[in-house]
Amino acid sequence: MGLVSNYLYGPNTLSTEEIHNLTIASYNLKLNPILLIGNIHMPKIIDIIKQVEIKEVCVSNQYKIEDIELLNNSTNSKISISINYENFDYNFFEHIKNNVSSFYYDLNIYRKDVIEKKSLMECESQINQLKSFAKPLYLGGGINISNVKEAIKTISPHGIDISTGLKKSNSVDEEKLKKILDNLGFDEIS
């Protein structure tokens, strides 16, 4: 379950206190929460990780190698890097691959007041380069009813983030979820 820090741009962000409370609730429900965070200095991220007691963190791809090493050496959390079309840097990923457990490729580019959307075709080459590192790759941003099957067939990600595609007010749109599962060949929501 992704918990997006309000230090990031985009929808559905949470305060540190909300993340802490949801982290506890997630562990009680045997769920694996992941903190998505960026736009602040690494020491502050480390403090937040320790404060919310989370076991996995996904940081935006804006940090230096030394920052990723500091994060790795200062916490016991698994580290994932969030990547998009605009901030892709293969050489950087080559240098940090031993400090991260997975990659999260976001088809969206989040800015303060706007979200730029990229197509799967535009990003496919970069995604395939990431797959060469033999680390789990998660795909998100713009995955919805119309493209979820193509995304899975084309990319074969370790997992997909369809949260925005399922949003209905402040809850999950079960009708959209059913359509996505039907599109993937599942008969019913369990």
Q: Which stretches of residues belong to each language-model region?
A:
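Glycine-rich, proline-tolerant flexible connector loops at the mouths of alpha/beta enzymes
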Residues: 1-21
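Functionally constrained cores in energy, signaling, and assembly domains
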Residues: 1, 33, 56, 80, ...
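C-terminal helical cap(s) of enzyme catalytic domains, especially alpha/beta-barrels
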Residues: 18-23, 68-71, 116, 152, ...
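Conserved anion-binding
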Residues: 4-9, 25-34, 40-147
